[in-house]
Amino acid sequence: MNGFVNWYTASVKRSPRLTNGIMTGSLFGIGDVIAQVGFPEKKGQKYDLARTVRAVVYGSLIFSIIGDSWYKFLNQKVIVKPGKHWTNTAARVGCDQLLFAPVGIPMYYGVMSILEGKSLVDAKKKIEDNWWPTLVTNWYVWPAFQLINFSLVPVHHRLFSVNIISIFWNAFLSFKNSISPSDKKVPVNFPPVPE
């Protein structure tokens, strides 16, 4: 593990966009595979490679760039009281959850809808159906983790640490994104989430 961390650290310092793009895209893809294999929407559903490719594209080309920039912004600009570590960390978590998450969630659903070849009207409907339940679920998952992430993890590793936890979050997002508006019931084999 130490060898991987050393390689990743050197790689992210040498070529941050490429490293973060590859890592984030890969982990978005893994999350989608988990969603498809572990929590299929319909019994006997076949694996959809194109769906995984869309997740990789979103993670690599969109989220990795925005996420990395966001974490750097938070670290450099969200300083409530210089020298007050926990106050600044709490402010960063607050910004992340009250500014980034409410925008990032509809961005995910909108972009994925477009990548699926759906219309803007369909994308809007997907966002309307999923934004609030996903945001509430986000608040159950992310604030505690981000408190640890922003307080203990160096800024150049924050996206990576988020990506590791995001494997399961991405599986959840992928599952939610795959449900059509007419599918209101969550399969019994999927962990319960607040809606």
From Swiss-Prot:
Any one GO cellular component localisation term in the record: mitochondrial inner membrane
Q: Where in the cell is it found?
A: Mitochondrion inner membrane
Query: Does the record's keyword annotation contain Chloroplast?
Result: no
Q: Does the keyword Magnesium apply?
A: no
Q: Which branch of life, at top level?
A: Eukaryota
Q: Where are the transmembrane segments?
A: 21-39, 55-71, 98-115, 159-175
Supply the InterPro entries for this chain.
Mpv17_PMP22 (IPR007248)
Q: What is its main location?
A: mitochondrion
Q: Which PANTHER family match?
A: PEROXISOMAL MEMBRANE PROTEIN 2, PXMP2 MPV17 (PTHR11266), PROTEIN MPV17 (PTHR11266:SF17)
Name listed for the protein in its UniProt record: Protein SYM1
Which lineage? Eukaryota, Fungi, Dikarya, Ascomycota, Saccharomycotina
